[in-house]
Amino acid sequence: MANFYTDNPNIKFYLTHPLVKHILELKERNFADKDKYDYAPENFEDAMDNYERVLELAGDVMANVVAPNAEAVDAEGPHLENNRMIYASKTYENLDATIKAGLNGVTMPRRYGGLNFPMVVYGAINEMVATADTGFENIWSLQDCIETLYEFGNEDQRQRYVPRVCEGQTMSMDLTEPDAGSDLQSVMLKATYDEKEDCWRLNGCKRFITNGDSDIHLVLARSEEGTRDGRGLSMFIYDKNQGGVDVRRLENKLGIHGSPTCELVYKNAKAELCGDRKLGLIKYVMGLMNGARLGIAGQSTGVSQMAYNEALAYAKERKQFGKAIIEFPAVYDMLAIMKAKLDAGRSLLYATSRYVDVYKILEDIERERKAVGDKLTPEERNECKTFSKLADAFTPVAKGMTSEYANQNTYDGIQVHGGSGFMLEYACQRLYRDARILSIYEGTTQLQTVAAGRYITNGFYGTVIADMLQTGQAPASVGTEDWCAAEYLPLKEKCAKMAEKYNEAVAYVNAQKNDEFKDFVIRHLYEMAADIIMSLLLIGDASRAPELFNESAKVYNRYAASEIERHYSFVMSASADDLADYRK
C-alpha cells in the first residue's frame, strides 16, 4: 500500500537535522513528562521512534483514505442547510480517519491531551495532508489556531478549549470582512460588553472565513467605541455551542472545493475575551497569521509534491514518436525544474519551522518559569531573540516562495500532460485550481514582500546569507565550516557571486532614498534573497544526503543564478523616473 511518509524519504531527512535534537530536548523539557505519562518518551531516541510511528500512520491515512476521496470531495463540496454548513460526505470520512489516528492537538502539551510534538513534525504531517487533498488540509490544519489561544488565553480557557481540539473539534479564525481584507485594521465587527451576563456580544459580518462553521472560532472584533484603527481591536473566542452565528452563504470558488469558505452573520453572539483588550490585531493576529503563513508554506509544498508526482507518472507512461515523453529534453527539463523548486521550497519550509520551534518553545518555557517566579537565563533569552528574528524574517519568504512555486509547478504539471491535462479526468487540473489561492490567502505574495522588506533594506538577509556561506546555517554558530562537500564547492562559489550582486542591488536601492521606488523593486530583491538562501540550503542538504538532493542542488543553483541575473539587471537599470511609465 502507498504511504506518503515512507514513500518520500525527503520528509524524513529533515527530521535528522542537527538542530532537531536541541528542539526536541527543549520541547520535552529534558523528558520531564516520562514520570507523568506512560506514553511520554524517555529520551531522544524514544521520542524519534514515537514521531516515526505517528508519521507512518499519518502517511497511511493520507495515501489510502484522504487522497482517494479528493476527487469526490472536489465534485460534491459543502452545502448549506438552515444556515448551517454541511461538509461533503467524504470529508466526514476524512475527519473520522484523522481523529481515529490521533492526528489532532499535535503541538499541544500532554496535560491537555495533545501529542506535544514540535513544529517540524507537525509540518511534516501538514505537508502530507496537503499532498492528499489541499482543501481538506485547510480544515485539518486550522487546529493550529489553538496555538494562539494556548499562548494568549488564560488557564481556564486552555483547560476548556485545548482538550476539545485535541479530541478533533474544528477551528476557524474569523478575521476578514467585506471591507477589510488585507487591511485588517478596518475591521468593524462590533464587540460590546454585556454586564448582566458578564460576557461580550458580537454583532456584524465576516467574509471569506475558511471552515467558518467550525466548533471554536477566534474572532477579531472592535471592542473600543469610537476607534477606527488597529488599536481598537481585540481577540475573542466564540463557541458554536453558544449559538448566535449564521452561515449566510458559501463562496463558489475556483478551487479547494472541499474547504468551506463562509460568510458569517454574528447576531448578538456570546463570546469571551482572549488576552488583553486592544491587542487583537497588533499582537495576537500577527502571531496567528505567522503560524497560518507557515501552514500555507507546508500546504504549498504538499501541492507541489502531488503535482510533480502526477507529472512524473504521466511522463513515464505517455509515449509519443515511439518513446516515453520523459525522454524528450523539453519534458525532462520541466520535470527537473519542478523537482528542484519542490526540494528548495521544502528545505526553506523546514528551516523556518526549526526557527519557529526554538523561539516558541523558549517563550513557553519562559511563561512556565514566570508562573513560579523564575525566568530564562541570559543565554536562553539571547537564543530566543535570535531565533524569533530569524523566524520573523524567514516566514514571509517561505510562504511567498513556496506558494509561487506551487502555482508554477501545477502549471507545468498540466503542460507535461499536454491536452490531457486540460481534461477533468486528470488530477492535475484540480491541483492547478487548488494552488491558485495559495499565493493569495493569509497575505498575498505582494504582502509577503512588504513583511520581508525591512529585512532586505536593513541588511539582515545579507547577514543570513553570509552566515550560511560560512557554516551552512544561520546563525553561523549553529553550523560548521566544513558544511559543504567538496563536490558542491563550485555551487557555493556561485552563491557567493550571487550574494555580491544581491548586496550591490540592495545598496543601490537604499541609495535612491525613495520609498516608492523601493516598494516598486522590492519583489526583485525579495526573490534574489530567497533564491540564494534556498540554493545554499539545498547545497547543505546535498552535502549530507547526495542520494536525495544531488540533482536538485545542481539544477536549482543554475536556475537561481539565471534568476539573480534577471532581477539584478532590472533593479540596476531602473530609477524613480521610470515609475511614471507604470502608474495608471
Q: For the regions a protein language model found, what residue spans apply to each?
A:
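A short core secondary-structure module
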Residues: 199-245
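Internal helix-loop-helix
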Residues: 59-60, 89-167, 210-212, 346, ...
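C-terminal amphipathic alpha-helical interaction region
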Residues: 91, 459, 475-584
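C-terminal helix-coil-helix/basic helical segment that borders enzyme active sites and/or dimer interfaces
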Residues: 343-399, 506-520, 539, 543
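Extended, charge-enriched "interface" segments that sit outside catalytic cores
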Residues: 1-81, 85
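A glycine-rich, basic-preceded beta-loop-alpha segment at the flavin cofactor/substrate interface
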Residues: 36-39, 241-244, 248, 260-292, ...
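Alpha-helix capping/hinge segments and adjacent helical runs
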Residues: 2-5, 9-10, 19, 256, ...
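A structural-propensity feature for long, helix-poor, extended segments
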Residues: 154-160, 444, 450-499
